[in-house]
UniProtKB/Swiss-Prot annotation:
This is Malate dehydrogenase. Gene3D superfamilies: Lactate dehydrogenase/glycoside hydrolase, family 4, C-terminal (3.90.110.10), NAD(P)-binding Rossmann-like Domain (3.40.50.720). One of its GO terms (molecular function) is L-malate dehydrogenase (NAD+) activity. The active site is at 187 (proton acceptor).
């Protein structure tokens, strides 16, 4: 039997985690023969609710689950963690400015970054799902002294999946036909779903979908505004689709990317495509056969794409500047 992998999930009694934990426990994320230790972090007022989730996890009797540790202590939660899925964050409430949200969450992610540095495994990898995820990841990364910056990721796979779904529907094909879909920038309404480099059935999207006006207009805005549309329709934010995207992200990071394809995840910029070094920005990324990752290089960026990328990167800079006092320089 393989050695168990320790997976820490924060915000473990929340809606996204409720969908996510059962996918992890079933083997969807790390494979059908990989045992898992689950370490679940919550704030003290949510510990009763978390106990209920733990009861359900136990009642499902998943063969792959080796142990389950619910806790409100970050050091206990991150002890020996190989994967940290930082799902918990304070949601934006009516009348709250984005800056307020950045500040409140900033304090949470400082503490989690420090606890990861103290307690996690040497090979730890950290995926931030809780919004604003790019800047939350930046704060955690800056405060996780000794943990390499290439271990920190923020999730834009939900945006990629939404974009693929829209393109497939428009083209009248199965979603698996859509490949090479890059999301650039921030996981926010400024993100840029890049149809110019995407493919449908191996052909450039623009050869399959001739409606350029739709591609440059409704397609982009639908993907950018999808989260808000779901809240309006459902009365609650997207939880199951976010959990599914987190599973997809970890699976993509953990397995070699098929030749010629890529996936989207926000990583610490190395200056590629003129995007300022040090920002946590979404790029097209590939996982290499040695288990590392790399930003896909040499993609054409036309004037339309450049304008869209610059706009979302500017928002990332503004967010970074708003939390600069929380970053270790």
């Amino acid at each position: 039997m393989k050695t168990p992998i320790t997976v820490t999930v924060t915000g473990a009694a929340g809606q996204i985690a409720y969908s996510l934990l059962f996918r992890i426990a079933s083997g969807s994320m790390l494979g059908p023969d990989q045992p898992i230790n689950l370490r679940l972090l919550e704030i003290p007022p949510a510990m009763n609710a978390l106990e209920g989730v733990v009861m359900e996890l136990r009642d499902a009797a998943f063969p792959l689950v080796n142990e389950i540790v619910p806790t409100s202590d970050p050091d206990e939660a991150f002890a020996g963690a190989n994967w940290c899925l930082l799902v918990g964050s304070v949601p934006r409430k009516a009348g709250m400015e984005r800056k307020d949200l950045l500040d409140i969450n900033g304090k949470v992610f400082i503490g989690q970054g420090q606890a990861i540095a103290r307690s996690a495994a040497k090979d730890v990898r950290v995926l931030v799902v809780g919004n604003p995820c790019n800047t939350n990841a930046l704060i955690a990364m800056h405060n996780a002294s000794g943990v390499p910056s290439d271990r920190f990721f923020a999730m834009t796979r939900l945006d990629e999946n939404r974009a693929k779904s829209q393109l497939a529907e428009k083209a009248g094909v199965h979603v698996t036909e859509v490949t090479n879909m890059a999301i650039w920038g921030n996981h926010s309404s400024t993100q840029y779903p890049d149809f110019t480099n995407a493919r449908i059935g191996g052909k450039p999207v623009t050869e399959v979908i001739k409606d350029t006006e739709w591609l440059k207009g409704d397609f982009i805005t639908t993907v950018q505004q999808r989260g808000a549309a779901i809240i309006k329709a459902r009365g609650a934010s997207s939880a199951a689709s976010a959990a599914s995207a987190a599973v997809d992200t970890v699976r993509s990071l953990a397995t070699q990317t098929p030749e010629g394809d890529w996936y989207s995840v926000a990583v610490c910029s190395d200056g590629s495509y003129g995007i300022e070094k040090g920002l946590i920005c979404s790029f097209p990324v590939r996982t290499t056969k040695d288990g590392g990752w790399e930003i896909v290089q040499g993609l054409p960026v036309d004037a339309f794409s450049r304008e869209k990328i610059d706009a979302t990167v500017n928002e990332l800079k503004e967010e970074r500047d708003a939390v600069s006092s929380l970053l270790k320089h």
